[in-house]
Curated annotation (Swiss-Prot):
PANTHER family: ATP SYNTHASE DELTA CHAIN. This is ATP synthase subunit delta. Signal peptide: none annotated. The gene is atpH. PROSITE patterns: ATPASE_DELTA.
Amino acid sequence: MGSATREARARSVSALAGLGSKADLATAEDLFAAGRVVADSVQLRAVLSDPAADRSGKDVLVKRVFGALSAPAVELLGVIAGERWSGQDDVLDAIEELGIRSIAASAPRTVDIPAELLAFGGAVTSDAELELALRSKLADPSAKAALVERLLVGKAAGQTVAITRQLVLQPRGRSVRQALREAARIVAAQDGQTIATVVTATPLPAAQAERLRASLAAKYGDLKLNQVVDPSILGGMRVQIGGDVIDGSVSSRLSKLRLQLAG
């Protein structure tokens, strides 16, 4: 992420915070729809990401193209358009992120959106037929969205369904699981949390998982555990928190031992 984008992103997130309760699920749906329009228009994408373009002109363009959307969504799109971004994809990232954050900010505290997103990502990865159906470039995006709704409506929160539907409608080169992980990270960040992905050969007992969470939280702050079972690591565990990886898996230790013996 370039420095310009990093600063623009921070200001955009701050603008969202300034809206308070005005930003909600409806705002997110409008932002997602706007993001798809921007993604489909080379000209619009180029103008909105052009640092040399007149800022007031961009604002007029946003209101002309997206004026029918809710006022909070139009305001946030205006903020994004007025910022300086490192590239066109960063504009799309920002629109999607503010949509996801709008959902997270307005969701009831009883709804665990990251857990539901990550659980669905795991289900997709473990079902080759489902993964193919959702990642196929030949499949109609609206059919993918309908499939997501059939699978999740009534089983997951409406907020989770909305985010997942957006990700399959506009994958932008990401795998379903990759997109869901990033969305879960954004939701957690909106709530002031970090996600720690813990890979073990067998499921961790609840008490052990809580001790691990508390231990990691002492160093990394408030966090949520994303538990992944992968028998191929043989034993031990591998923990990833952002860019930090703590690999204590048996498979990793065996690999290092083989390298030492070969040397």
